[in-house]
């Protein structure tokens, strides 16, 4: 394959073509993915995000993989929406350890009218800290989507999870079409899309191909494509599911990189179960984004210091954003926190 063909951006992938990618010899697939990756990205830079659960547990959805679903007894404590100030403090800490994007996740089917003002203030406050912002709040109306865009939200995460054909085996409380509609609203509002899926739920290779086809054949590719490895949690229906073969996981990352050459492909949930060699292969396959910090919503994530040690051994550096001088930026953080503390738009989680 010529270099120009290898980096072509397409939106017309067929199942037969994607199957052929998955069926390549492993070394050939990784070579192709790395070639595509180098055409668009510095191969030794990885974008670093931090994810905070701003509202945990008691979700009305029945996603079989999720410990936050109210349908399953996983021992997870239910928590109400975090106070805006506490979210901003967590964002400032994320900034201090090197994150460039702060992602906020709420266990909702959709945000309520009473919660939206607090969510919008979180976006505005995190933006003032100099971080990119991302949220995952469930299904959105067109009006809610526009309000988030007006507040300055950069990314909205709404995963497709799996192929349309396998989807009904995992979720029954939200349709695939509703997920696609939310993504369309996000794009229409001018925000960037973060959307991917989960491996290890009992899906076939064709289902993995089908997920990537749905994402790559959108009118515009998602700017961020998180590929999660199922974190099996006791109490969920998928707790005893068979482990994903590490090479199959790496293959999926590589195919995602080839199909969506300009997207950040995120090595997302499941890193706690991956050894350093598997993570290194993931970066070779074209993954160039990770979540950074102690927890990924409600499951363990490798500690930040451990991540930086691995980066140093591999010669990888965090992707940077254009920043102010340190003292100017620190002053901006402190001022934003003071302004938010004095704001009347403050969610008292204890009294709700």
Swiss-Prot record:
GO terms for molecular function: 2 iron, 2 sulfur cluster binding; 4 iron, 4 sulfur cluster binding; biotin synthase activity; iron ion binding. Residues 44-262 form the Radical SAM core domain. InterPro entries: Aldolase_TIM (IPR013785), BATS_dom (IPR010722), Biotin_synth/BioAB (IPR002684), Biotin_synthase (IPR024177), Elp3/MiaA/NifB-like_rSAM (IPR006638), rSAM (IPR007197). [4Fe-4S] cluster binds at residues 59, 63, 66. The keyword Disulfide bond does not apply. Keywords: 2Fe-2S, 4Fe-4S, Biotin biosynthesis, Iron, Iron-sulfur, Metal-binding, S-adenosyl-L-methionine, Transferase. This is Biotin synthase. It comes from Pseudomonas paraeruginosa (strain DSM 24068 / PA7) (Pseudomonas aeruginosa (strain PA7)). The lineage of its organism: Bacteria, Pseudomonadati, Pseudomonadota, Gammaproteobacteria, Pseudomonadales.
């Amino acid at each position: 394959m010529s270099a120009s063909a290898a980096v072509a951006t397409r939106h017309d992938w067929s199942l037969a073509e994607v199957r052929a990618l998955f069926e390549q010899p492993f070394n050939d697939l990784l070579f192709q993915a790395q070639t595509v990756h180098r055409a668009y990205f510095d191969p030794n830079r990885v974008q670093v995000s931090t994810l905070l659960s701003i509202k945990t547990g008691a979700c009305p959805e029945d996603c079989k993989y999720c410990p936050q679903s109210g349908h399953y007894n996983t021992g997870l404590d239910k928590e109400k929406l975090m106070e805006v100030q506490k979210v901003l403090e967590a964002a400032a800490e994320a900034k201090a350890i090197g994150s460039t994007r702060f992602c906020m996740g709420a266990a909702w089917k959709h945000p309520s009218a009473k919660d939206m003002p607090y969510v919008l203030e979180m976006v505005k406050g995190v933006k003032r800290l100099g971080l990119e912002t991302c949220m995952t709040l469930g299904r959105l109306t067109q009006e809610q989507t526009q309000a988030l865009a007006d507040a300055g939200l950069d990314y909205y995460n709404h995963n497709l999870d799996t192929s349309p054909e396998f989807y009904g085996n995992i979720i029954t409380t939200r349709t695939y079409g509703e997920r696609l509609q939310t993504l369309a609203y996000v794009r229409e509002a001018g925000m960037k899309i973060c959307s991917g899926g989960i491996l290890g739920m009992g899906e076939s290779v064709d289902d993995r191909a089908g997920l990537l086809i749905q994402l790559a054949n959108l009118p515009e590719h998602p700017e961020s494509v998180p590929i999660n490895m199922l974190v099996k949690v006791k109490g969920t229906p998928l707790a005893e599911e068979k482990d994903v073969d590490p090479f199959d996981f790496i293959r999926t990352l590589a195919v995602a990189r080839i199909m969506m050459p300009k997207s950040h492909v995120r090595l997302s949930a499941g890193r706690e179960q991956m050894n350093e060699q598997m993570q290194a292969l993931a970066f070779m396959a074209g993954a160039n984004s990770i979540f950074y910090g102690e927890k990924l919503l409600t499951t363990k994530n490798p500690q930040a210091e451990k991540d930086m040690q691995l980066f140093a051994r591999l010669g990888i550096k965090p992707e940077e954003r254009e920043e102010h001088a340190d003292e100017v930026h620190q002053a901006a953080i402190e001022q934003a926190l003071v302004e938010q503390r004095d704001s009347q738009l403050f969610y008292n989680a204890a009294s709700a």
